[in-house]
Amino acid sequence: MAGRNIDEKLRCSFCNKTQDQVKKLIAGHNGVYICDECVEICSDILDEEFETEADAKEVVDGMNINLLKPKQIKEFLDDYVIGQDEAKKVLAVAVYNHYKRIMSQSDLDVELQKSNILMLGPTGSGKTFLAQNLARLLNVPFAIADATTLTEAGYVGEDVENILLKLIQAADYDVEKAQYGIIYIDEIDKITKKSENVSITRDVSGEGVQQALLKILEGTIASVPPQGGRKHPQQELIPIDTTNILFICGGAFDGLEKIIESRMDKSSIGFNSELKEKSNDDVGEMFHKALPQDLIKFGLIPEFVGRVPVVVSLDSLDEEALVRILKEPKNAIIKQYQALFGLDEVALEFTDEAVEAVAHKSFERKTGARGLRSILESVMNEVMYEIPSDETISKCIITKEAVEGSAKPLLEYRTDAVKKAQ
């Protein structure tokens, strides 16, 4: 075997410089060499990477994120959200894993992928409220965005980057802090593809928006206009890394239960046959059986479904649950009104029949927990108008008749006389 030519100069295997062009050439196995200049470059790269990791850890530590165990997270949610036990468990685990991943990034050899969340549930079932309480518990910035306002770039409407601006604003323009926040995108079911068939018309608020959301959901350096609106060349943009932002997408997904039922081949023959009317309970049960293929059939593109691997199904709220929502949580609506009346030194009381009547109205309107406050506002608006001007009122009693509109709330006066509100 021929030996090395003695006139052949040794070279760095990385930059190809000869031994005469560098100060030092270090030999490795199998004739591999590296020069002092390449060693210095590699050292700088590693220092920069470690410094970035240290900076990120410093930001996370400085935020005082209150990371509790999944059981503790669920117990906290139990104080504010009635029912939805399975959904709370899934959310607790997903949120715990997300922030545990962030806090342990520099300690792991394996890169853990982010798991964004998709919540399925009828209007008023508590999707937004769950997300809000999670952010409050964790002490991280939180923003809510409406998917229906988003359009593809170049069309009238908001760019997807405007979602990130809301989070930056929630963090008081502290971008580092915003990069570890939570964004809840509501009405995500409204940006589904209008049809499985290719159309000649442009679907500017459907598939195109889903495509635009993919990068920020997965993790990218996005450029955000500081004042919102469309980006233009002269504008100075705010860069933000979305890698560690937790995205929770929610929607009512009206009609998804029919797709699930058709797949399961229950109560129907053939996919497009008419399906029987389902009760709210049946719909909730069907949502628990949703598979990625059902969501794709509904109109979410496969890539989008892949970016939201954690699917949480919320149950429809029955009248009993609505009654509990009115009375039991720490910040129950009735407790809020009682505190409000207390500021005017007036006691507020609801009869059991009145509470049931409010729950019944909301259930009939199919507005869920969201409709409870508007019903109470309409019942008590007149008396809330009168009370601040009449210091003799000591107590207000809301009856079933007051809720139904056939009578006014009862007022007790400091003279102990009981009269109807005039």
Curated annotation (Swiss-Prot):
GO-annotated biological processes: cell division; proteolysis involved in protein catabolic process
Binding site for Zn(2+): 12, 15, 35, 38
Keyword Chaperone: yes
Residues given in the record as ATP binding sites: 122-129
InterPro entries: AAA+_ATPase, ATP-dep_Clp_protease_ClpX, ATPase_AAA_core, Clp_ATPase_C, Clp_protease_ATP-bd_su_ClpX, ClpX_bact, P-loop_NTPase, Znf_CppX_C4
Keywords of this entry: ATP-binding, Chaperone, Metal-binding, Nucleotide-binding, Zinc
CDD domains (UniProt xref): RecA-like_ClpX
Any GO MF annotation of the entry: ATP binding
Matches recorded under HAMAP family: ClpX
PANTHER family according to UniProt: ATP-DEPENDENT CLP PROTEASE ATP-BINDING SUBUNIT CLPX-LIKE, MITOCHONDRIAL, ATP-DEPENDENT CLP PROTEASE ATP-BINDING SUBUNIT CLPX-LIKE, MITOCHONDRIAL-RELATED
Complex formation: Component of the ClpX-ClpP complex. Forms a hexameric ring that, in the presence of ATP, binds to fourteen ClpP subunits assembled into a disk-like structure with a central cavity, resembling the structure of eukaryotic proteasomes.
Protein function: ATP-dependent specificity component of the Clp protease. It directs the protease to specific substrates. Can perform chaperone functions in the absence of ClpP.
Family the UniProt entry places it in: Belongs to the ClpX chaperone family.
This protein's name: ATP-dependent Clp protease ATP-binding subunit ClpX
Organism, as annotated: Lachnospira eligens (strain ATCC 27750 / DSM 3376 / VPI C15-48 / C15-B4) (Eubacterium eligens)
